[in-house]
Each structure stands twice: as structure tokens, then as C-alpha cells.
């Protein structure tokens, strides 16, 4: 078993951790950087390199630095979050939808 911390060890936020074996790759969180963070956001290629072969993504909670890039995970990869956290995310996106369409981003989780 291998554990790789892609982001979050040397910064606050933007957490992405990989747990893998010969036949399985799981990601824990896929967060965006916190505002004001001096680290560059991931490129599309970096996101594909990290998430492309994952079997699933599990989110620890609904804060943006843990789920902020969930909408960039390929649709073929299953994503999981607790029911309470999902309800909070849906409430947030429902409120935001009054000013734009954010629904497609949350449907994947």
C-alpha cells in the first residue's frame, strides 16, 4: 500500500491524498486552494494525472479546501461524501443558483 500526499502537507487547504495498491487507487479529498494562498492551482493536466485512474474519491467534509475541485473529477469516477455534508453542499448550491447555474457541479458528488 502506498500513501501519497499530493497537496496539503506544506500548505493549509487544497487537500488531496492518494491511497493506492497494485489494484486500487482511492483519493481522499480534492480541494481547491484557500484564497490568498501563494501556491498555484492545479492545471487540467495535473488534475487528470492525479484523478484519471482513481477508482473513487472520498470527501472528509464540505469545506472548499476539501471538495473545491470535485466538479473537475471525470464523471466515470465515483465520488462519496456523507449525507449531512451533501445536504449542506446542496443548500449552498441552491442558494447560489439564484445567481447562476451551479447545479451540474454538485450532481456529481
Language-model region placement:
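Extreme N-terminal starter segment of soluble prokaryotic enzymes
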Residues: 1-2, 25
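Short Gly/Pro-enriched turn/cap motifs at secondary-structure boundaries
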Residues: 7-9
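Metal-dependent catalytic neighborhoods of phosphoester/phosphodiester hydrolases
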Residues: 68-76
Amino acid at each position: 500500500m502506498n500513501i501519497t500526499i499530493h497537496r496539503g502537507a506544506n500548505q493549509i487547504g487544497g487537500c488531496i491524498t492518494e491511497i493506492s495498491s497494485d489494484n486500487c487507487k482511492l483519493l481522499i479529498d480534492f480541494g481547491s486552494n484557500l484564497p490568498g494562498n501563494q501556491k498555484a492551482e492545479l492545471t487540467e493536466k495535473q488534475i487528470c494525472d492525479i484523478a484519471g485512474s482513481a477508482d473513487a474519491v472520498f470527501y472528509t467534509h464540505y469545506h472548499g479546501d476539501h471538495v473545491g475541485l470535485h466538479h473537475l473529477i471525470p464523471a466515470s469516477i465515483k465520488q462519496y461524501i456523507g449525507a449531512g455534508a451533501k445536504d449542506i453542499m446542496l443548500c449552498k448550491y441552491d442558494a447560489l443558483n439564484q445567481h447562476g447555474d451551479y447545479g451540474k457541479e454538485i450532481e456529481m458528488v
